[in-house]
Amino acid sequence: MTNPGKTLWLAITCLALGCVWTQAQPSAPTPGQWASGALGQTLDVKVMAPKADSPSHPLPVILYLENLAAPRAGTESDEVILHDFIAAGYLVVTLDYAHNPKARVPWINRDLLALRESLLQKKFLGEFEIDLNHVFIVPAGSRLRRDVVFYREPGRTLAMDIIYPTQPAQPVGAVIEFSCDNQNRMGDGSLTSCSDTLLDGEATEGLAVAMADHPVKAPYKGIDPMPECAWKIKAAVRTLRAAGTTLGFNGKIAPVGFSRGSGMALLLVTTRGMNAFEGRGECTNTSSDVQCAVVMSGRFTYLDLMPEDHMLPRYTKAWGERTNHLEAWRQAGALDYLPQATLPLFLTINCTEGPDAQLQMATLRKRLAELGSDEIFMMDHEPRGHKVSLVPDILSGINIYLKTQLAR
């Protein structure tokens, strides 16, 4: 009998091995162009500013990517979409990829990061006052729905921003991420520092993507209170699924998580079907189930920590001495809710992550193996430390995994 996890792994391996990153040097851009490192050439650029009397200052930005290599998922015309973005007060910038075969995952991810970096450093669109907390990379044929509320608590309303193919020819799956910026979920500085291009990349491949507020308000100190965090992230999944019923989604959702968001992605898997974490937040009559998850470097259990872990004093202050309050420590870890084999997971971590992070990933993998749960694991051998991978094999593997699981 064929093992579906191994079959998927073989497919990912065979396809990913063809993805070799070689960065050609583009010619110097002229006004109206942007230098694409992924393609090794310049792209034609058009900038469309909102009316002078627009109240949006600094300006939120839409980077609208045209003529990508991946099949276009949304069927609504660019003319209508762009008109609406400009009317809503966005500074709209179109970049024409001219159907270059490398204008897709995994190669385009380097461009997606470079675009965000160039805005942050004022090397691109420097003549405009830009709202760096609201820069959205939108593939042609897609729209943006902002500030979709999924949870309310005193002093804070949690919401998400959804980029989705509009009027899709076929229903699409959705990917959700909980931001590593606890203050501004789309903060360009946070996305750039983490080299996080996952949602931007998957949107170019025809999936709907949602960046959600992290369940813990700023400032983040490494403590994820339970059961509150579970209430909030499940409300986010329910809300995304409910929104998708009118936006052309197929009802299948995958969380992806890095750093402080990785435990949230895993928690959605390990607490599937646990009613104790339901009934709070929006859309309580909708399912919070997820169909798969991408889990990167993070903390998954607090029962197996290194003696010199620098966070131990903070955990002890929050939960008491571990020997006397073991259950409180257990309840804080996403992995410790897993009673049996679960969904096949995609796992990855950088080879130069610290020993604490490596131990967490090793512990997660060991537990999955003990339970007989399928996993796909890819080590990132590009020595970049605590970053989301930009390695083509890994990005391609994630993309194939998500498309496969969200189509089932």
Residue spans for each PLM region:
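N-terminal cap/lid segment of alpha/beta-hydrolase-fold proteins
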Residues: Q25-S56, V138-A169
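Mobile cap/lid helix-loop segments that gate and shape the active-site cleft of serine hydrolases
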Residues: P71-G74, G141-D147, R152-G155, V269-M274, ...
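Alpha/beta-hydrolase active-site loop
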Residues: A103-G126, D224-G244
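Primarily recognizes the serine-hydrolase "nucleophile elbow" in alpha/beta-hydrolase
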Residues: E117-R143, R238-P307
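Short, proline-enriched alpha-helix->beta-strand connector loops that line the catalytic pocket
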Residues: L132, T286-Q291, P339-L345, D374
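C-terminal catalytic histidine-bearing segment of alpha/beta-hydrolase fold enzymes
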Residues: D161, F346-T348, A357-R408
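Active-site-adjacent alpha-helix of alpha/beta-hydrolase-fold enzymes
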Residues: C194-T197, A203, H310-N324, I349-F377
